[in-house]
């Protein structure tokens, strides 16, 4: 059975990544897939790259009226104001399985249209490991912005916030830019920061470590924590004693907070910047309960209202890999490709069968809870 994929243009502001790259489009067409690609003004990839790869180019937003047998693939969630029923099979990150704000409304659109959601976050292999994730570049970009904010605080007044950031064409340009800010901060007499990473052994943590090493932070300044170190339960004074804290955990169940105001309001606190890569902002079990808004590239930080100690900011951008959209997209699409190749047999392929069962389970829960 041949499969037709329709790559929809992203609508989330400043989202420049793509679920399919020209490289993967060319590969899938070679396997017998038919692929439509929407014109997308914000994609890092030029439409001609897709055209040369063999895709059929269609107008932005045309997925809405596309034939029902097309599988619609995208990355981020659709605009909140859209309410029309979803009639297709969709592959995307929907952020609606962990009780996030508005999760029932998201699922209701699929239920009302008799559509199906294959959530990219929950495509897992037989060992329960995600088949594809942006974690590495989320950690890489998160560490970059965390160091940028720390450096900015050394060279600017507390009344100023880290200015807007824009995507970089490649990793080398990002390292050069943040490295320059870091060196300027050290010229003020500031000591090299200590960075504590929780979730250091995962994809995200390894990305954060990789950036910090490449920008020149000494190994001894990178404090790597994972399950063993956090097993005693928070809050952890070690976080307040670090200069930068990067949260890279995958939140799957309620846990004790990592940090609280009692630790933050001490006058000797060193912590200046928190990077919540996980960005479970609206999750009731968020282990960093010191902020309540997701930040954006245009305004990357939010100030924490502490009563003592130096200025403290949180970075909680939920699409950090978009700072390096081309490399992040290629990395992700490469890992996703083997699962996409199984789409012709998705009704028996374990990866897709599990994803559909999960969708059905949460849909039933949404219906049940809406009736309560």
UniProtKB/Swiss-Prot annotation:
It is an enzyme of class 1 (oxidoreductase). L-saccharopine binds at residues 17, 76, 100, 130, 134, 278-280. Pathway: Amino-acid biosynthesis; L-lysine biosynthesis via AAA pathway; L-lysine from L-alpha-aminoadipate (fungal route): step 3/3. GO terms for biological process: lysine biosynthetic process via aminoadipic acid; protein import into peroxisome matrix. The active site is at 76 (proton acceptor), 95 (proton donor). GO terms for cellular component: peroxisome. Disulfide bonds join 204-248. The keyword tRNA-binding does not apply. Keywords: Amino-acid biosynthesis, Disulfide bond, Lysine biosynthesis, NAD, Oxidoreductase, Peroxisome. Belongs to the AlaDH/PNT family. Catalyzes the NAD(+)-dependent cleavage of saccharopine to L-lysine and 2-oxoglutarate, the final step in the alpha-aminoadipate (AAA) pathway for lysin biosynthesis. PANTHER family: SACCHAROPINE DEHYDROGENASE, SACCHAROPINE DEHYDROGENASE [NAD(+), L-LYSINE-FORMING]. This is Saccharopine dehydrogenase [NAD(+), L-lysine-forming].
């Amino acid at each position: 059975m041949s499969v037709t994929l329709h790559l929809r243009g992203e609508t989330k502001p400043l989202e420049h990544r793509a679920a399919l790259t020209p490289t993967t489009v060319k590969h899938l067409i070679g396997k017998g897939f038919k692929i439509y690609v929407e014109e997308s003004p914000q994609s890092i990839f030029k439409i001609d790259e897709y055209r040369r790869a063999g895709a059929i180019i269609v107008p932005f937003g045309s997925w809405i009226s596309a034939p029902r047998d097309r599988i619609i693939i995208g990355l981020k969630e659709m605009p909140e104001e859209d309410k029309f029923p979803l009639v297709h099979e969709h592959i995307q990150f929907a952020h609606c399985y962990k009780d996030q704000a508005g999760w029932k409304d998201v699922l209701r659109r699929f239920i009302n249209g008799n559509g199906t959601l294959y959530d990219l976050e929950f495509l897992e292999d037989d060992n329960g490991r995600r088949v594809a994730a942006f974690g590495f570049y989320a950690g890489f970009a998160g560490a970059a912005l965390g160091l940028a904010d720390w450096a900015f605080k050394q060279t600017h007044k507390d009344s100023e916030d880290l200015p807007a950031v824009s995507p970089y064409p490649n990793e080398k340009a990002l390292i050069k830019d943040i490295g320059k800010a870091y060196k300027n901060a050290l010229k003020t007499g500031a000591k090299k920061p200590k960075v504590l990473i929780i979730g250091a052994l995962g994809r995200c943590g390894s990305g954060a470590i990789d950036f910090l090493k490449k920008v020149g932070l000494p190994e001894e300044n990178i404090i790597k924590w994972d399950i063993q170190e956090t097993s005693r339960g928070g809050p952890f004074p070690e976080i307040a004693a670090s200069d930068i804290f990067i949260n890279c955990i995958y939140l799957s169940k309620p846990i004790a907070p990592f940090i609280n105001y009692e630790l933050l309001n001490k006058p000797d606190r060193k912590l200046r910047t928190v990077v919540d890569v996980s960005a479970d902002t609206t999750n009731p079990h968020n282990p960093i309960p010191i902020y309540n808004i997701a930040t954006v590239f245009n305004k990357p930080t939010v100030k924490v209202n502490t009563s003592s100690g130096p200025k403290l900011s949180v970075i909680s951008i939920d699409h950090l890999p978009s700072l390096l959209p081309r490399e992040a997209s290629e990395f992700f699409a490469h890992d996703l490709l083997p699962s996409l190749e199984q789409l012709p047999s998705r009704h028996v392929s374990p990866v897709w069968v599990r994803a559909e069962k999960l969708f059905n389970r949460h849909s039933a829960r949404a219906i049940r809870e809406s009736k309560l």
